[in-house]
């Protein structure tokens, strides 16, 4: 499932960036307002590139994430206009929802303005990193870096996908958010593990930022789709007791549903989708932390994607008969 938020750049921002490529603008501060990327502030060139970096520091607010599009003095070889630095400030004390939304929107912003315009990127939760001294340290760090290991490259790839959320110094990466769990949700998980119910639904209270209980029951596999909302994201655990090839099985199925407007569904607000998406791994751990194995994980956008047949095919894929290879004749003189 994509971690992109889908929040677009406003026409005003696109025009402002285009004009700045040939004008006197040094930086453009960009924020998210009403589910749109908009210009919050513009400052003109005052001195040389490095000295003007103090301007970037001056537009930051200690509690508010933002992007800064910072124009360098050198022009692009391949494109019309100047080279730019993409800056992403996300303070530690910003709200979790803001962190996730800004992290997931970074890629959209670069793509809509043209990623090739940006020759360098700075991510940090520390305001002092957005200054002349901070930039010099950033360049020294780049020059001293050893070639990336495979694991480091993977983390960088995750950053490109929008998983960066800040967290001190030069930044950090997270794979999810760990919200507190409501007592009713904990009880529901225990009841599920102890086989009191074969189905439970959990959700996220977006206002309280907490994992909450939605429902529990004993149902047949055919009823799962009717339990899944076509308008709200949700998490579902189902124990599928069945026989396969003469063996009695209890398969645990974990479903994350996030309606996207397709197949008759209604897409949830962007911030809600991001909070649910970033919580799915931690919701899964509510069950797996009890040494319970998840046999099948499904991510869907519509209840219509779930059926008994689709679940069985995922759990027990039909065997494909392999064609018998032609035998090679024995070499002459061999028995």
UniProtKB/Swiss-Prot annotation:
Q: Name one GO cellular component term.
A: actin cytoskeleton
Q: What is its main location?
A: cytoplasm
UniProtKB keywords? Actin-binding, Cytoplasm, Cytoskeleton, Repeat
Task: Give me any GO biological process, just one.
Answer: barbed-end actin filament capping
Lineage: superkingdom? Eukaryota
A GO MF term: protein tyrosine kinase activity
SUPFAM superfamilies associated with the record: Actin depolymerizing proteins (SSF55753)
Q: Specify the ADF-H domain's residue ranges.
A: 4-140, 176-316
Q: Which Pfam families match?
A: Cofilin_ADF
- Keyword hit for Zinc: no
Q: Where in the cell is it found?
A: Cytoplasm, Cytoskeleton; Cytoplasm, Cell cortex
Q: Report whether Zinc-finger shows up as a keyword of the record.
A: no
**Residues covered by region (Disordered):** 307-335
The Basic and acidic residues compositionally biased stretches are: 316-325
What do we know about how this protein assembles, alone or with others?
Interacts with G-actin; ADP-actin form.
Write out the similarity annotation: Belongs to the actin-binding proteins ADF family. Twinfilin subfamily.
Tell me, in a sentence or two, what this protein's role is: Actin-binding protein involved in motile and morphological processes. Inhibits actin polymerization, likely by sequestering G-actin.
Official protein name in the record: Twinfilin
Species per Swiss-Prot/TrEMBL record: Dictyostelium discoideum
Q: Which gene encodes it?
A: twfA
